[in-house]
Amino acid sequence: MSTKKTFEENLQDLEAIVTKLETGDVALEDAIAEFQKGMVLSKDLQKTLEDAEKTLVKVMQADGTEMEMDA
């Protein structure tokens, strides 16, 4: 049974992929596979941030204060 990685773990994985691709020492096929993994991680991280922002807005509204957040 696999456990879901934390935001920080996914961010570290994405940073490792970016570093690996920036070195240029990766075969084309491997680079494409790593790029695809990176895109999936990037989308997951973005969704996590958007969900966190929505949660914060709800908390602020429940508290009675208004807060506008730029999306």
Swiss-Prot record:
It holds the Pfam family Exonuc_VII_S. GO terms for cellular component: cytosol; exodeoxyribonuclease VII complex. It comes from the Bacteria. The keyword Secreted does not apply. It is found in: Cytoplasm. Its EC number is 3.1.11.6. Keywords: Cytoplasm, Exonuclease, Hydrolase, Nuclease. Its main location: cytoplasm. One of its GO terms (biological process) is DNA catabolic process. One of its GO terms (molecular function) is exodeoxyribonuclease VII activity. It catalyses: Exonucleolytic cleavage in either 5'- to 3'- or 3'- to 5'-direction to yield nucleoside 5'-phosphates. HAMAP family: Exonuc_7_S. NCBIfam families: PRK00977.1-2, xseB. Bidirectionally degrades single-stranded DNA into large acid-insoluble oligonucleotides, which are then degraded further into small acid-soluble oligonucleotides. Heterooligomer composed of large and small subunits. Belongs to the XseB family. This is Exodeoxyribonuclease 7 small subunit. The gene is xseB.
